[in-house]
């Protein structure tokens, strides 16, 4: 079951989330929007197991990376039965 992984532009390019991910869902890509000149990207969301280690590792006050579990996404969209 894949989950939705959202990277926000508050990312500071620290790579903590990438290193914390046990399934290599995240990677860093070039980006001029922060001092580190890179941002996290989630090209392999189908491999996300929903452990949320990336969220726990994020040092920003507003989590720059969020994992939305499939049942959370369904509930938030009002599609739950």
From Swiss-Prot:
Short name of one Pfam family: Fer4_7
GO molecular function: 4 iron, 4 sulfur cluster binding; electron transfer activity; metal ion binding; oxidoreductase activity
Domain of life (superkingdom): Eukaryota
GO biological process, one term: photosynthetic electron transport in photosystem I
Reaction equations catalysed: reduced [plastocyanin] + hnu + oxidized [2Fe-2S]-[ferredoxin] = oxidized [plastocyanin] + reduced [2Fe-2S]-[ferredoxin]
Membrane topology: Peripheral membrane protein
Required cofactor names: [4Fe-4S] cluster
Predominant subcellular localization, coarse grouping: plastid
InterPro entries, per database record: 4Fe4S_Fe-S-bd (IPR017896), 4Fe4S_Fe_S_CS (IPR017900), PSI_iron-sulfur_center (IPR050157), PSI_PsaC (IPR017491)
GO cellular component: chloroplast thylakoid membrane; photosystem I
Binding-site residues for [4Fe-4S] cluster 1, renumbered to this chain: 11, 14, 17, 58
4Fe-4S ferredoxin-type domain ranges (all copies): 2-31, 39-68
Enzyme class: oxidoreductase
Keywords noted in UniProt: 4Fe-4S, Chloroplast, Electron transport, Iron, Iron-sulfur, Membrane, Metal-binding, Oxidoreductase, Photosynthesis, Photosystem I, Plastid, Repeat, Thylakoid, Transport
Locations listed in the record: Plastid, Chloroplast thylakoid membrane
UniProt-listed Enzyme Commission number(s): 1.97.1.12
Entry-linked HAMAP family: PSI_PsaC
Subunit structure: The eukaryotic PSI reaction center is composed of at least 11 subunits.
Name this polypeptide is given: Photosystem I iron-sulfur center
Natural source organism: Arabis hirsuta (Hairy rock-cress)
Species classification: Eukaryota, Viridiplantae, Streptophyta, Embryophyta, Tracheophyta
């Amino acid at each position: 079951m894949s989950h939705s992984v959202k990277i926000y532009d508050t990312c500071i390019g620290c790579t903590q989330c990438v290193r914390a991910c046990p399934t290599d869902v995240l990677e860093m890509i070039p980006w001029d929007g922060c001092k580190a000149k890179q941002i996290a990207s989630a090209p392999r969301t189908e491999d996300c197991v929903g452990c949320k280690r990336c969220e726990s590792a994020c040092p920003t006050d507003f989590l720059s990376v969020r994992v939305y579990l499939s049942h959370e996404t369904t509930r938030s969209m009002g599609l739950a039965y």
